[in-house]
Amino acid sequence: MKVLVIGSGGREHALLWKLAHSPSVKEVYVIPGNDGMTDVAHLIPVKGTEDILDFARLMEVDLTVAGPETVLTEGLADKFAEKGMAFFGPSAAAAQIEGSKSFAKNLMKKYKIPTAAYETFTDEEKAVSYIKKRKKYPLVIKADGLASGKGVVIAETEEQAVQAVRGMLEGKTFGSAGESVVIEEFMEGEEASVLCFTDGNTIVPMISAQDHKRISDGDMGANTGGMGAYAPAPVMTKELDKIVYDTILLPAVKAMKKEGCPFKGCLYAGLMITKDGPQVVEFNCRFGDPETEAILPLLESDLAKIMLACTKGTLKKERVEWKNACAVDIVLASEGYPATHSSGEEIVGLEEAKKTGCLVFHAGSMKKKGRYFVNGGRVLNVAAVAPTLKEARDKAYEGCLLYTSPSPRDRG
């Protein structure tokens, strides 16, 4: 099987690595990729939907996999479907479950999927008036559209809430993503991520994970795209796994089918485990980053076969098995991230980190004359697998300590 992955980050490197080790795969390509991925895939320097389609057709690619959400909300899956080519990922209509917070919240309300109470606004003054009537804080303000995982403000005061709403609706904070805002109640509890494979009917949950979005230890500092993750999430018990399947995953997939936009691909449920049970914080239409870098090292089955089955509607025939182990992924980010980031510093110690048994996935790096340099905010992911979370964490940090550049930032 020939497989093509779309994307260029750590998540895509993890997907490429796992697909390259699939017994059914003989060739792996990535568009556009990054220089750190050449150990497992051929980098293809093409741009634009038509060029991607032409390449897949020319090379007789058997399966194309989307990494980032933007290509899905823009309809890449639909273009492949029109050409009769297998594509792992939802249609543009189904990708609304991530592309529009209001779509997702309205879907959950209609089909009684547990989530926080909310209101949606496009009018700034109406939103401010609603906020001024609220007595309970914190309050969660979300940009309706895509904002690279950073479009959420947890307002501790009325002043912060008003400032967040004005910034979004005036287009200053998140551009067109903030043309509509969702204001919802703050949920207390512990977060967990449950991803699943689905062909639109059958659902196969993956091992649960927990990611950490704050830039600093102690869950402090600015929100980021994700600074680390581990799997499985300790908060998730077998009982909770079943509750999540029965009350969230299954109803969501059934709801999408009833709405005329069946979901095929990876459905990601970001959860808050509250005193009243699991509640949905958000749905994503693709693999999480950095959760993927912690989840995929635990998968024992052939990833390419699972994905292809999702495109064909035959997922129920596949056996999906997982290691009885734990994984921890730590993100190494450049100085200034997430507000800005440095670039150009040399990355040293990659081979030493790999010798510890750690996996190294590249995100924001580039290669010049055989040496790697920083070229983004989140630069590298160092992942480790071990019998316990503590052992996996210690092993991952051992790998991180062997990496050096003038200004690395990490947390786990």
Task: Report each predicted region and the residues it spans.
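ATP-binding N-terminal substructure of ATP-dependent carboxylate-amine bond-forming enzymes
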Residues: M1-A92
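Active-site nucleotide/adenylate-binding loops and adjacent lid/helix of ATP-dependent enzymes
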Residues: L4-V5, G99-S180, P234-L250
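Internal nucleotide-binding/catalytic subdomain
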Residues: A155-T292
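Short, well-ordered beta-strand elements within core beta-sheets of diverse protein domains
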Residues: A229-P232, R378-A386
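Active-site "cap" helix and flanking loop/linker of ATP-utilizing ligase/carboxylase catalytic domains
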Residues: Y245-L267, N284-K355, K368
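Short, well-ordered alpha-helical segments
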Residues: A386-C400
